Swiss-Prot record:
Zn(2+) 1 binds at residues 892, 895, 904, 907. Keywords: Lysosome, Membrane, Metal-binding, Phosphoprotein, Repeat, WD repeat, Zinc, Zinc-finger. Signal peptide: none annotated. Pfam families: WD40, zf-RING_16. It comes from Drosophila melanogaster. Disruption phenotype: Flies are viable and fertile but ovaries are significantly larger than ovaries, due to increased activity of the mTORC1 signaling pathway. A zinc finger (RING-type) spans 912-960. WD repeats lie at residues 127-167, 172-211, 215-255, 258-303, 307-351. This is GATOR2 complex protein Wdr59. The modification Phosphothreonine is found at residue 373. A zinc finger (C4-type) spans 891-911.
Length: 969
């Protein structure tokens, strides 16, 4: 792995040139060269154009241009009306579009072309659904622009086709994108920040990111690609660090700058070997630091730019097209001041590494080049290193390579980059021992970490593999990981290996450590992995482990436990569960007690998708068993008849290692009882007697708490006033009885005793139908039906006296003619309203009580009490009213039957087709009531916006439909 160097900014050092013997860097405090104050400007974004003459200040109320060459400080202000602040503004960086700039406001991006007089709005890019957080222009193609948003998308726009993004990069994550940037060397790579993570995309293949980098612990505020190296970038974060990354080695940062406050921006200098960062103090209390760092050494900043009194919002580099030896830094702050800082040649020299540092750093590589081994001599990296090394002369002087012009910054001044940047950063000195310990993988298989002491510079580990244990102590020298200082390894007391095997393992450790430290790389984790592999191989060769213990490392087990870390998005199979059903049966299953759950640290296979595959592969099976069962686990108990001896009954034999499904009867813990449900009565001939009988049933089954309830129900059903015997309708109009009954039903329904609640609701639901006096007095037919002659010739006479009250309704319906009778219909409605009147349950409560009855009917179905269930369902008469309205009746083309649904269920074919697009209609539809033609509602609206006749038959659908609807209303 590449080394990591974590450095903190120190105190101000002493001045010294590059050739001074002191290692401290010069800490310069620099004031701004130019200063512009705009107190009335509310700009929140800033950008410098391609020529370096104009600075754009963009805000919610205006766009302003400041010419840097003028000393009067006047602004070219252009008003704009927007209720949102400008989140970011960027000028194009290609000369062919140098007058274009992109301004992001809320969810859209405006492309503005600056003319001689006023800005011209060329286009608006709309594709994001949340606020746009960052934009960046392509460095090679002037037509490409990338934007990112909180909606997690990064859109690449082509200005030649601005209606939609040319490419959308979707990061499947919960956090939005905060920063985005194109690669400055090739332009093919793109980096997007999502909180503390980075996604590296290749725009030639936008289906998925090419690299995932866990960069910071907090949000990333800035991304900047290197101007010289294609794969290197720097990030600034809320956690107070600036990190250098190489996307070829995304696992760890190359170098780290640590500050005491959040870092808002960090960008490479266009020339030289520096980086500028903005440090924002916590809660605005502290110094608003604008610091220049060297990429080769991060102990101290090179320069501090002072002058701003508030938070620096943004900064940009001002290219000098006439003189490329100098660059200028332009900053805009919340104190409403625009400052210009000059980066002179002395600052750029301080960013370069000293000659002593270069020579001391690469002396080991020179020694390797004198006696090269064939593989390393032919390695391309070795050739690159040899080409970038300083040239040694006989007198000890060191001649460096001549300076060159930078092709990436207008052919300007280009300082010789330090050799360790010209080659891969993986070969530079590594981080401290403390940082190496913090990056150590503590979940390595077979390895337990006992002690990690960075102060005393030693570590202790316990390795268990192949049935043996090794206690390893590693001691690090102060110069580790220099090529001449590998760590020292020692096997301590507690090691169970023989002296011969221990010597072989120590030799393996020293060889691996020497190979790593020769390249100034860390070696601890690689040595531990090599030790585990050598222990397995050596112990298996000498036969020093018991076979039963080696079963733990069998290929079958390793195959089952492998590569599960790659299946992080796949849910692990359920190994236990519990579920209730409606009648109180509890079903449970779990893994067997004798099964051993193993750790998931060593994974080389996929995560099992089902519980049976777990047991089949041996992941949860008894791996210490001598015999392995090849069959998959089954959730079912196998019932087999034991033959051979008479009188033997059926036995259940459980398979070895298979889970058992347990079914428990928990009905005794609930408020319902199957035995009581079988005996309960719903006889309505005498409701009081029925209540007395149900109360006695509760007493017999030990439910003494329900006896007072049925006693109250008996009192409700008993008439209390003599007048009620003359007219039983008075019995059902007692408000006290209605309130008491509804309170009892709701109390037991809420408490979970749905059985008692439903029985009470059914008993007092409606009038008795089996010869009760109330029904006989309620159903009184009109006088014309009592006579033997019907007023209509098509209605047969009805003998009401000979008919019972139970089938009166059916006779009335059967004897109706097709002609309409006012008197008969009115009387039937009156009879139905009287039937509702003879009930102690209000009509508004009936839908709720019907739901209780249907739920209790499902419980009776589970108990197989079908007759009781049918009796309960007879009392659910409050069905929802049919939906009334205009329906589209279409005819199926196959069966030629009229259908009121969009699909013919028997034929499995759609029946409603749009007359415009000829496609089946599955969503909102509309049709003419006169001609019947219609289709998708969107297509119909688009058609009738320009036409007033039907597209099929020429019918004036709008007028005819309005007339028919007026008649219906």
């Amino acid at each position: 792995m590449p080394p990591t160097e974590t450095l903190r900014p120190g105190e101000r050092g002493t001045a010294g040139g590059p050739g001074a013997g002191a290692p401290e860097q010069t800490y310069i405090v620099r004031q701004s060269n130019k200063y512009y104050e705009h107190r009335d400007s509310q700009a929140t974004a800033m950008s410098v154009d391609y020529s370096g003459q104009w600075v754009l200040l963009a805000g919610r109320g205006h766009l302003a241009l400041q010419r840097l060459g003028q000393d009067d400080g006047s602004l070219r202000r252009h008003e704009r009306q927007s209720k949102y602040e400008v989140s970011v503004a960027e000028f194009a960086i290609c000369p062919s579009r140098k007058e274009y700039c992109a301004i992001a406001t809320s969810q859209h991006i405006d492309i503005v072309r600056w003319g001689t007089a006023e800005p011209h709005y060329e286009m608006s890019l709309r594709g994001h659904t949340r606020t746009v957080t960052d934009i960046d222009w392509h460095g090679k193609d002037p037509n490409l622009l990338v934007s990112c948003s909180i909606d997690t998308f990064s859109h690449i726009w082509d200005l030649r086709e601005p209606r939609k993004p040319a490419l959308s990069l979707n990061a499947v994550c919960m956090s939005g994108a905060t920063q985005v940037g194109f690669n400055r060397v090739s332009g093919n790579l793109l980096a997007a920040a999502h909180d503390g993570d980075l996604r590296i995309w290749d725009i030639r293949k936008g289906s998925c990111p090419t690299h995932y980098i866990t960069a910071h612990l907090n949000r990333v505020h800035g991304i900047n690609w290197s101007h010289k190296r294609e794969t290197c970038l720097a990030t600034a974060s809320q956690d107070g660090t600036v990190k250098y990354f190489d996307v070829c080695n995304p696992r760890r940062a190359e170098k780290i700058i640590t500050t005491m406050s959040p870092v808002w921006r960090a960008r490479y200098t266009p020339i030289g070997n520096g980086l500028v960062s903005i440090v924002v103090p916590h809660l605005g209390r502290g110094e608003n630091s604008l610091l220049l760092w060297s990429n080769s050494k991060q102990t101290d900043p090179i320069c501090s730019f002072v002058g701003h009194t508030d938070v620096i919002l943004d900064f940009a580099w001002r290219p000098n097209r006439e003189s490329s030896n100098e660059i200028e830094l332009v900053t805009w702050s919340r104190d409403r001041t625009l400052r210009v800082w000059k980066i002179d040649d002395n600052m750029l020299k301080l960013c370069e590494p000293s000659a002593e540092e270069i020579e001391s750093r690469f002396e080991p590589d020179l020694s390797e080049l004198r006696v090269p081994t064939p593989p390393e001599f032919l390695h391309p990296r070795s050739i690159l290193v040899a080409a970038s090394l300083p040239i040694s002369t006989g007198d000890g002087a060191c001649n460096t390579l001549p300076m060159a012009r930078s092709p990436s910054f207008g052919g300007g001044y280009y300082r010789r980059e330090e050799p360790h940047i010209a080659r891969s950063l993986t070969d530079q000195p590594t981080c401290s021992l403390h940082h190496e310990f913090s990056l150590l993988n503590t979940n390595m298989p077979h390895v337990e970490v006992d002690t990690l002491d960075a102060i005393k510079r030693y570590a202790c580990f316990k390795i268990c593999a192949g049935g043996h244990t090794v206690i390893l102590q590693v001691t690090f020298t102060t110069s580790y990981p220099s090529p001449s200082a590998p760590p020292d390894f020692q096997l301590c007391q507690g090691t169970t290996l023989s002296s011969e095997v221990s010597g072989v393992l120590l030799k393996v450790l020293r060889c691996n450590a020497l190979q790593r430290v020769k390249k100034s790389r860390t070696c601890l984790e690689q040595c531990l992995r090599a030790l585990v592999a050598a222990m397995k191989k050596k112990v298996a060769a000498v036969g020093g482990a018991d076979r039963s213990q080696l079963l733990l490392q069998s290929p079958r087990l390793e195959g089952a436990l492998s590569s599960t870390l790659h299946d992080a998005c796949i849910p692990y199979p359920r190994t236990s569960g519990v579920h209730f059903n409606a009648i109180g049966m509890l079903t449970t299953f779990a893994q067997p007690v004798n099964n051993k759950r193993l750790t998931l640290r060593q994974h080389t296979a996929l995560t099992p998708r089902t519980f049976s595959s777990i047991n089949g592969s041996g992941l949860l099976g008894n791996v210490m068993a001598t015999a392995q069962r090849e069959a998959n686990a089954s959730f079912y108990l196998q019932e087999r008849m034991i033959s051979g001896k008479p009188g033997k009954q059926r036995a259940i034999r459980q398979m070895n290692g298979s889970p058992v499904v347990h079914v428990y009867d928990t009905s005794s813990l609930l408020h319902i009882s199957r035995r009581m449900a079988r005996e309960f009565s719903l006889d309505k001939c005498n409701i009081a007697e029925t209540c007395r009988k149900n109360g006695e049933i509760c007493r017999q089954h030990g439910r003494l708490d329900l006896v007072p309830v049925w006693l109250l129900a008996e009192l409700i059903a008993t008439p209390q006033i003599p007048h009620e015997t003359l007219n039983d309708l008075l019995f059902y109009k007692d408000p006290f009885k209605k309130s008491l009954l509804e309170s009892l039903i709701m109390h037991y329904a809420i408490s979970g005793d749905i059985q008692t609640a439903v029985l009470l609701a059914c008993l007092f639901d409606k009038c008795p139908t089996g010869g009760g006096a109330i029904m006989e007095k309620t159903v009184r037919l009109p006088p014309q039906l009592n006579s033997q002659i019907s007023p209509y010739h098509t209605v047969l006479p009805l003998d009401v006296k000979s008919s019972s009250s139970s089938n009166t309704w059916q006779q009335l319906k059967q004897l109706r003619s097709n002609s309409w009778s006012d008197s008969l219909d009115l009387e039937i409605k009156q009879i139905q309203s009287d039937a509702y009147a003879c009930s102690l349950i209000r009509r508004t409560k009936m839908p709720l009580f019907d739901q209780f009855k249907r739920a209790y009917a499902e419980i009776l179905f589970g108990w197989q009490l079908l007759s009781k269930r049918a009796l309960i369902l007879k009392h659910t008469q409050n069905t929802p009213p049919p939906v009334q309205g205009v329906e589209f009746v279409t005819e199926c083309r196959k069966c030629a039957k009229p259908k009121r649904t969009p699909k013919c269920e028997p034929c499995k074919r759609p029946v409603l087709f749009c007359v415009l697009c000829r496609l089946p209609v599955k969503g909102a539809a509309n049709a003419c009531l006169a001609c019947g033609h219609g289709g998708h509602i969107d297509h119909m609206m688009q058609w009738f916006e320009k036409h007033n006749v039907c597209a099929t038959c020429g019918c004036k659908c709008l007028e005819r439909t309005s007339e028919l609807l007026a008649l219906l209303s």
